[in-house]
Amino acid sequence: IDGTERVLALDENTGEVLWSHTWRTSYRMLMASYAIGPRATPTVDDDRVYVLGATGILLCLDVESGAVRWQRDYARDYGTSVPTWGITSAPLVDGARLIAVVGAESDGMVLAFDKYTGDEQWRSVKVAGEMGYSQLVIYDAGGVRQLIVWHASALVSLDPDTGNIYWEQPVDVGAGMAIATPVKGGDYLLVSQLYNGSTMMRLNPDRPTATILWQGQSRNPDQPEGLHATIGSPIIIDDFLYGLGVNGEIRGLDAKSGARIWEDIEMNAEARAQWGVVRWGTAFMVRQGDRYFMNSDEGNLIIARFTPSGYEELSRTSLIEPTASAGFGATRLYDRLVNWSHPAYANRHIVHRNDREIIRASLAAADYQ
């Protein structure tokens, strides 16, 4: 299956298309029902924007014109095996470097490029399986900056300056589905997945090491305990963990032990009434003061609070129509419609998209009085 991918630059206030850039690619490596275009969010850095296609076409473009400054092809240049559901991890700008999950055979799961030229600066982590789908993130812990990488075999901490490994913890990831971003709260570091639930690490506050605090014991996402977050990343507040399980249930857990303290199924009540089971339930959560903006896969913008006592929904509005099908394999095209695109927040507005449109809506209270 051949396709055309593109990036658009729009005027923030009017939505006018300022420029676009397209490139040809082949989706033959992907499951056919997922041959639907790029997944990774564009990364803007000064006068450059970095974009990544679903098959590993990485481009550095000029922000003003869309002109190509440099380009790499993961499969052609590095021997990358494109995973079943496409390449999703957006490159991360760190100083003069651009760091990316590349899966370069056989010793370059992660590569650092000169962000101005595209020249390779370092590579790290042996490729022992699929690259996964999780986003790179840098956290301060143990007196250093740690680049956290979650791929389909392990959770790894690297020195972002050199690529040297600080620590590495093997994690059994079902079907290569390392998707949600690793989440830090205090000395806690969490990853969560569909089949094996959550793994909580304790970060050493004095040096760059980590140990397992607790780990989910069940491969069954329908089990009543723990948290099997699949796409949307959970959150950690003090000594408590909150997240959306694969069946659309919101759960609160004790971060120290992993024990469930409450469950709420009302957020997806409408979809649950229509479909029975909200498989692949997803919401993207962004903190705003003592509350969270939540974008549900039904296209709703929800404002809510999470406490050890439960989930408190403050407001909800239908923001955008879900247009993509959830699920797995051939049956995906017959499942409920979802929106798995993460929105952007800027200048008291939210910008969101589906397969058909891009919208911008005000979040300013004064606009609704």
Labelled PLM ranges:
Residues 1-369:
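Noncatalytic, solvent-exposed loop/strand surfaces
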